[in-house]
């Protein structure tokens, strides 16, 4: 055996120790940051975007406004956003769910509030008019019909999804 053993000097020991401790500290700081950055990508989303709004029994041929809340996720921030819909049954008994957002400048339309134009959706901001099925009346400010909500009926309840544009009139 040789007397030439490999000895660690004090300087090397401190260097190894500080490097190890620094590495653990850096990992401790980086792990939460990485989890924060990648969590939305790795998290599973909800199975459906449909929200229960009303009992089908409540829906008549007269448009009725239903207010509801939708869970919205903006990156890491989750909130409940209030929404509303004008819902009625047409002559065939089919359910129609219209967005109340005017296609002119985004004001809220109301049903049957303009005395000069009964049985129309009316936007009081700029006097926009829509027929009962949500079609914009020519000669008024709106440039497109009201959006329609996706919907499904399940167990006697009406579920609404996203509002879909219907295009130019």
From Swiss-Prot:
Rieske domain: residues covered: 62-160
Entry's cofactor comment: Binds 1 [2Fe-2S] cluster per subunit.
Keywords assigned by UniProt, alphabetized: 2Fe-2S, Disulfide bond, Electron transport, Iron, Iron-sulfur, Metal-binding, Oxidoreductase, Transport
InterPro entries per the UniProt record, alphabetical: Rieske_2Fe-2S, Rieske_2Fe-2S_sf, Rieske_Fe-S_prot, TAT_signal
GO molecular function, one term: monooxygenase activity
PROSITE patterns: RIESKE, TAT
Disulfide bonds: 107-125
Binding residues for [2Fe-2S] cluster: 102, 104, 123, 126
Cofactor(s), names only, from the UniProt record: [2Fe-2S] cluster
Described function: Component of the menaquinol:cytochrome c reductase complex. The Rieske protein is a high potential 2Fe-2S protein.
Family statement drawn from the similarity comment of this UniProt entry: Belongs to the Rieske iron-sulfur protein family.
Protein name: Menaquinol:cytochrome c reductase iron-sulfur subunit
Organism name: Geobacillus thermodenitrificans
């Amino acid at each position: 055996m040789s007397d030439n053993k490999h000895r660690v000097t004090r300087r090397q020991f401190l260097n190894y120790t500080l490097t190890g401790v620094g590495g653990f500290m850096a990992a401790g700081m980086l792990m939460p940051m990485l989890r924060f950055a990648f969590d939305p990508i790795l998290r599973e989303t909800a199975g459906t975007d449909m929200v229960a709004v009303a009992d089908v029994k409540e829906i008549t041929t007269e448009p009725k406004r239903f207010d509801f809340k939708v869970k919205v996720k903006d990156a890491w921030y989750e909130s409940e956003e209030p929404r509303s819909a004008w819902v009625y049954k047409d002559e065939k008994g089919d359910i129609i769910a219209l967005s109340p957002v005017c296609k002119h400048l985004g004001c809220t339309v109301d049903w049957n509030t303009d005395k000069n134009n009964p049985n129309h959706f009316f936007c009081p901001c700029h006097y926009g008019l829509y027929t009962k099925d949500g079609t914009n009346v020519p000669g008024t400010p709106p440039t497109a019909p009201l959006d329609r909500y996706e919907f499904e009926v399940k167990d006697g309840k009406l579920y609404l999804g996203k509002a879909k544009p219907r295009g130019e009139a």
